[in-house]
Structures are given as C-alpha cells and as structure tokens.
Amino acid sequence: MLKRFTVSIFVLAAFVSLAVAADENQNVCKGDPDKWQQIFNGKDLTGWKHVGPGGDTVEDGLIRTHGGMGLLYWTAGKIGNCMIHVVYKMRDENDNSGVFIRIPIEPREEWMPVHYGFEVQIDNHPEKSDEDEYHSTGMLYSLTKPLAKAWKPGPEWNTMEITLDGSRTIVMLNGVKVTDYKDGDPVPDRKFDFEPQHGPRPNFGYMGLQNHSDNDIVFFKEVAIKPLKK
C-alpha cells in the first residue's frame, strides 16, 4: 500500500450512505451455488477495467501486474452474499498486491477503493515495510489480525477463498481460515494515512485486483465467484 492519502474525509459519509441503501437487487453474483463462475477468461481482460497508474496484461493465461499503484476491477457490477475464489502467486517472496471487495461504487481512481472498500492483503512479509501482522496475507488490510498464517512461499500457487455473507467477511487461505470479520468488530487505531478509513462497508460492492508497484509482480491464474447457498 503506497503511503499517501488523497481522498477527502467528507466523501466518506456519502459512500456510507450508499452502503446502507444497498440491497440484493444490486447483486450480480447469481446462478448455481455449487458451480464456480470464472470471471477471468484466461485469454484477455474482457469484463475488466483498470484505474490508476500501471496496469495489467495477460501472459500465458495469467493476469500479470505492472507498476502501480492501480486497480483492475470487474465491471459487471456489485457482488455480495457470495464466495470469491482467487489463485495467485508472486514473482518473488515479498511481492505485494491485494484483492479488493465491498467497493461501494464503480471506481474512477485508485484511492477510493483503498479507503472505502476492504483489501484482502497479499504480502507475506509486511515487517520488511515496517508494518505489522495486521498487514499480512489474508488480512483485511490494517483491520484484522491473523487467525493463522497459511500462506505458501511467494513463487508457489496460493488459493484464497473469500466469503461475503451480509456484513461478515471470511477469508480462507489454502484451506485454512485466516480472517473472520463483521461490521462492528473491534479494529486497531489507524497508524498511517494510507490505511483505510474505519466504518461500515456495503453488503454488495465491486471487486478488483491491485497492481502495487514496479517491484511487486503478482500473477493471477483464476478469479471466480458463486452465490452462497440459501
């Protein structure tokens, strides 16, 4: 996460109002709850859009991040009451990225999702950036402490599954629960201005993949969603 803050605090109230008004009619995650819907086709970035510096390409069937900090988001609409399946690896052991969820409106720049959505962090060694375990892989960035440390070394494939169940967010990493959070749970004080604003997030929001910097190369092999069983 780059260490700067450019979003006005006054905008937060507007986004929270949007979050409160969200309902199931906005949810585009529909279909068979027993079948994953692949939203990355393995060939190109159809259905995705990039905002902010840097970008993403598809190489050998994988999304590859370039430069940053920016965000590649899925344009189909908001999702909630669903599961998100992501398979990724890092080029090196300590590369940085994240899976963004609960983004209240369609992004037009890179910082709104940071402050008003949630980032499920990808960073195996936050201590190398003078950050603590609240900033490690599988955490809601700066908000949750790991229930377990289940990441594989950076160049190995990792499987992340994120459950959005109302306001509750559960993160499974390689089959191990590492995060279980719902609105209202206690969170630590903000230490840096680049950390997200505190407060509720929408039950239904956009999702995206972060490209962090020139030195942080992450590859995504699968991105899929399916609705929760009712």
Task: Label each residue range with its predicted role.
Residues 20-230:
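Carbohydrate-interacting regions of secretory-pathway proteins
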Residues 7-8, 106:
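General helical structural elements
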Residues 8-17:
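Bacterial N-terminal signal peptides
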Residues 1-4:
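Positively charged n-region of N-terminal signal peptides that target proteins for export
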